[in-house]
From Swiss-Prot:
This is tRNA methyltransferase 10 homolog B. Its EC number is 2.1.1.221. Pfam families: tRNA_m1G_MT. Residues 113-310 form the SAM-dependent MTase TRM10-type domain. GO terms for molecular function: tRNA (guanosine(9)-N1)-methyltransferase activity; tRNA binding. GO terms for cellular component: cytosol; mitochondrial inner membrane; nucleoplasm; nucleus; TIM22 mitochondrial import inner membrane insertion complex. It comes from Rattus norvegicus (Rat). Residues 1-30, 42-98 are annotated as: Disordered.
Length: 316
């Protein structure tokens, strides 16, 4: 009886160690759990219904799907660009109809400025910057002169009636040229003439007028047949009559800006009065006069209060 009772639990235990389908339980064998998982994968793969039997074909369809998506994006961008072009076209037409100035691209404005400057070469007034006196200038003075050249050119580009500019006595291997390249962005593309030739040999002497503050003759008008010369000289030691003596050496006519005729000295803390101007300031006065034909108005733009002069009519 005792033996029979002990045997029955063993048979029951044997039955309990099997699942309904007769598979061994995981605790009986270490591989049984892996077998169950493998069986589940074999019985059901969620990708199986979507993936073609041929994996290469499935990959090809995936590439085609991405290609179609990319083509839709490209087509959408093209459509938006076309709509934007149409919008700008309508806007330009409306601006012209309303008499307002249309907005132009930077490239268009740059080309327009270049064309205007080139026209001045054939029909505009001529201005020569004499750069033959830079050999004794310090690095600081050369830097200041390079900055003045940049500002002069910038003013000429904006002028309604630009001058044609000559930079004479200007060697491309000189320290000043290197300083201009360093300080002035796009200097090599400036629309002007650069030459090593001296201004006195480049033009007939009778067509030249050297602008110098030491001249006895005030400049009365700007003549298109005359070449006006500005001395490209920055001298912190203030050597007097350098440009005047150079003009006399070549028997060239001289003139000064009519500061004395239209301005008077004013009291200042340092009791300082000077008619010596930077080359870009001289140019601004000439350019303003060419546009307005009004010396007081032109002088007001170029002669700063620090020079110790004010317009006569401002006192009256």
């Amino acid at each position: 009886m005792d033996c029979e009772w002990e045997g029955r639990p063993q048979r029951a235990g044997s039955r309990a160690s099997q699942d309904p389908e007769g598979l061994p339980e995981a605790r009986d064998d270490g591989l049984s759990e892996s077998f169950l998982l493998l069986q589940m994968d074999v019985e059901y793969d969620p990708q199986e219904k979507r993936r073609p039997a041929n994996s290469a074909a499935w990959s090809s369809k995936n590439v085609q799907r991405k290609q179609r998506h990319w083509e839709r994006i490209v087509s959408s961008k093209k459509s938006k660009r076309k709509q934007e072009r149409e919008r700008r076209k309508i806007k330009r037409a409306e601006d012209l109809g309303n008499g307002t100035c249309p907005q132009h691209s930077k490239r268009f404005l740059k080309a327009l400025t270049k064309e205007k400057l080139l026209e001045a070469k054939h029909s505009g007034p001529r201005l020569c910057v004499d750069l033959s006196m830079t050999q004794h200038m310090s690095k600081k003075e050369l830097s200041r002169l390079a900055g003045q050249i940049r500002r002069l050119y910038g003013s000429n580009k904006k002028a309604s009636r630009p001058f044609w500019i000559y930079l004479t006595g200007f060697s491309t291997d000189s320290p000043l040229y290197e300083e201009c390249l360093r300080m002035n962005d796009g200097f090599s593309a400036y629309v002007l003439d650069v030459t090593e030739e001296d201004c006195f040999s480049l033009f007939p002497l009778e067509t030249l007028v050297y602008l110098t503050p030491d001249s006895e003759h005030p400049l009365e008008d700007i003549d298109l047949s005359t070449v006006y010369i500005i001395g490209g000289l920055v001298d912190e030691s203030i050597q007097k009559k350098v440009t005047f003596q150079k003009a006399q050496e070549y028997s060239v006519k001289t003139a000064r800006l009519p500061i004395q005729e239209h301005m008077i000295r004013c009291q200042n803390e340092k009791n300082f009065h000077s008619e010596i101007l930077a080359i870009n300031q001289v140019f601004d006065i000439l350019s303003a006069y060419l546009e307005t034909r009004d010396w007081p108005e032109a002088l007001k733009k170029g002669v700063s209060p620090g020079k110790g002069y004010i317009l006569q009519n401002s006192v009256e």
